[in-house]
Every structure is written in structure tokens, then in C-alpha cells.
Amino acid sequence: MCIRDRCTIADNEVIITPPESIEPVSIKTAIYPGFPTDLQAQWTVLLACASGKATVTDQVCGDRFNHIPELGRMGLQAHVVGNQVTVYGGTQLSGARVISTDLRASVSLVLAGMIAQGTTHVGRIYHLDRGYERLETKLSKCGIDIRREQYDEFAAPKQP
């Protein structure tokens, strides 16, 4: 079934019916027009919801898997070998204290927090702010329970 078969467009809304299950789909990043390396962290979170095993191979920036250990704190079953991560989906993620290491990792941790059971605290959100202006405000408008708080252990490094 195609995504367009799951969408209904009404006067003031788009209604999307989710699938009963998400099938795992392995991807390889590539330069345009291939799968963008900037989306592989988010794809990893989607694979956490899938029913089965899939791989993400980053052929552009092979060192962009710093989010995997943090997702592991939330219960993601995955392992990294070189420029590839294997994700074993189907495990419910749990809220945890996690720390973002870069822009892409930070948004993947926010997405993971949105689907996790319990509360997730994402630290070092200054990474997130570099690419997503007032994301918590926008997500709140969509009904997501999210807010910005300051924790000393998550604060940006002080300049000398």
C-alpha cells in the first residue's frame, strides 16, 4: 500500500491512517539524489519501531553514529560496525536522560523521546537550536508534551 492510500485531504486537515506495523527497510546514504546522510539518525529511530532487523550504512559520513549509544540508554537494540549500524526493531523505547552530540543526533533523540514510554531528558540542546528554531514550541502545537528546562549537567560548555 502506498502512503497516498493512507491520506485523506479534507477542507482544513490531512488525515493519515498509520499502518498496522512498520516493516524494516535497510538504507545506504549517498550523495544527491540518494538517501541523505542528514536523515540517517532519524531513520534509525523509525527502525526502532519496525518489526525486525535492518541496517543503515552511511557511505557519505561514516562516523555519524554517536546517537546510537544514547538511543541504547532508551532500550534500542543496535550495534555499530564501521560505517554501518544494525538495528533490531520491535522493542518499546523507555524514557531516559540522554545527551546529544550534534544537530542530527539531537533531533533523533527528541523523536525517540516522543515515542518512548516515560519521560526523556535530552541534554546539550544547544546542538538542536543550531538547526531547529523553537522546536519545542512547534511540537507542543502538535500535541506533544515537551518543554525546555535547564539542567547544569546538560549545560553548554563555558567559554574560557
Each language-model region and where it sits:
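Short, structured segments at the rim of ligand-binding sites
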Residues: 4-160
